[in-house]
Amino acid sequence: QYSESQESGHNRNAPDKELTTEEFQLIFHQSQTVDIEYDFINITTEMIETERKVSFTIDGKEYHLSLTPAASQSVLPYGTKIKSAIWWTDNDTHIHEEDYSDERWDSRAIYENLEIMATILVRTENGTSYYDGVFGEGIAMKVVRSLPGRLMNIYGANYHFVYDSNGSVYDVVLNGQDEPAVPADMAVNNFYPKLLVLVDYSLFKIFNENFEETVKYLTIFWNAVNLRFRPVQHPKVNIIITGIVIAKNEAAFQHVYRARYSKNSKLVHTGRVIDNGRYFFGTNFDPYYDNYDASFTMASMDDPTGKGGATVIGGICSSSNNIAYIRDVGSYSGVKVATHELGHLLNGQHDSDTTCSEKINDNIYTIMAKQGSTKASKFVWSSCTLTAFANFSKTTSAACLKDTYRK
């Protein structure tokens, strides 16, 4: 075993003021004109075989996290297809192969802790570890970011920024047409939701239009969603990202562009994204992608009604209902909503529509609560949702989930 710790004599009163505009954007995913509340922490690491014992202090409170390698394969396997989309002068969306994949994002780099919902991408160089990821839930959810190389030389490589995620807790599902459940010959014991992830230009801009930063973020984001499904045992759920498409201009994703309330508007009608998507995906993506069970479009635009996401209950294997939309602002704010929407696709209903309560106590709410609490610090699966997943696994509507590759 070994320990890592490093001190620096540099003034740490306002390290954010030493960031360039680009560095500030890449760390906080916001403009430098925004006043950010953050903590500047020194992380020490003790290695015991494959376990990382990480310690740091925030506002006098000591944190001791035990991080272990991801229990399942990373949601973003090496070699995942990554493409870009651009709206061209011929009034059409063009898809381009980016040929961008990196083994740094595979399962060997992801560490986790189920108890505190920590998902951390670890990079080790010259005996020093750098941590990027998220831990905690709800009001207690925090983002940890390593320093850019220039600041490591000033403060020391073990220093990191930590700030609140401000995760979204509100959701309204868009219900589709109910289809009769047809019993399957055999239940599916393991769900492998194969997802096509689309990053709208509104979100890509938050990452400084940087492909590496975007892919890194998506890796952490969807591994965090996957971790929230870990308590589900019947069937077990393991997400696989089979493709990523990143919009390089505003009109590239027409299902989002045409769902805005007005031209040049930063407001979007969540329900229209789903309605528009039924045509958009059939036209644009069938020739490029066939190995996905559902698409998730991620954008940073607001819905004036407060909706954070939308999809169709039980629609994951349906060619017309396997579309989901989530709002995310680059601070993992959409992790809970993405978990919720995938829960809907796997046939979970709002707990308020079942016999289960949405609220365990003031601090704990269910993941499938229609409107969670802004004060909740933990989310759990209700018995009603777990039963819905199990029942879904026994129908032909879940058949596409049994394989890691869609046939």
UniProtKB/Swiss-Prot annotation:
Q: Where would you find this protein in the cell?
A: Secreted
Q: Which GO terms describe its molecular function?
A: metal ion binding; metalloendopeptidase activity; toxin activity
Q: Alphabetically list the UniProt keywords.
A: Disulfide bond, Glycoprotein, Hydrolase, Metal-binding, Metalloprotease, Protease, Secreted, Toxin, Zinc
Pfam families assigned: Reprolysin_5
How is the enzymatic or functional activity of this protein modulated? Answer: The gelatinase activity is inhibited by EDTA.
Residues annotated as glycosylated are N42, N91, N126, N166, N391
Q: Per the entry, which co-factors are needed? A: Zn(2+)
Q: In which tissues is it expressed?
A: Expressed by the venom gland.
Q: Identify the GO cellular component terms for this protein.
A: extracellular region
Q: How is the cofactor bound?
A: Binds 1 zinc ion per subunit.
Active site, renumbered: E341
Enumerate the spans annotated as Peptidase M12B domain: 191-405
- Where would you say this protein principally sits, based on its record? secreted
Q: Which PROSITE patterns match?
A: ADAM_MEPRO (PS50215), ZINC_PROTEASE (PS00142)
Q: Which pairs of positions does the record mark as disulfide bonds?
A: C317-C400, C356-C384
Q: Which GO terms describe its biological process?
A: membrane protein ectodomain proteolysis
Determine if Glycoprotein is one of this entry's keywords.
Answer: yes
Question: Self-association or partners: how does it assemble?
Answer: Monomer.
Function, as annotated, reads: The recombinant protein has gelatinase activity. In vivo, injection of this recombinant into fifth instar L.oleracea (host) larvae results in partial insect mortality associated with the molt to sixth instar, with surviving insects showing retarded development and growth.
Name of the molecule in the record: Venom metalloproteinase 3
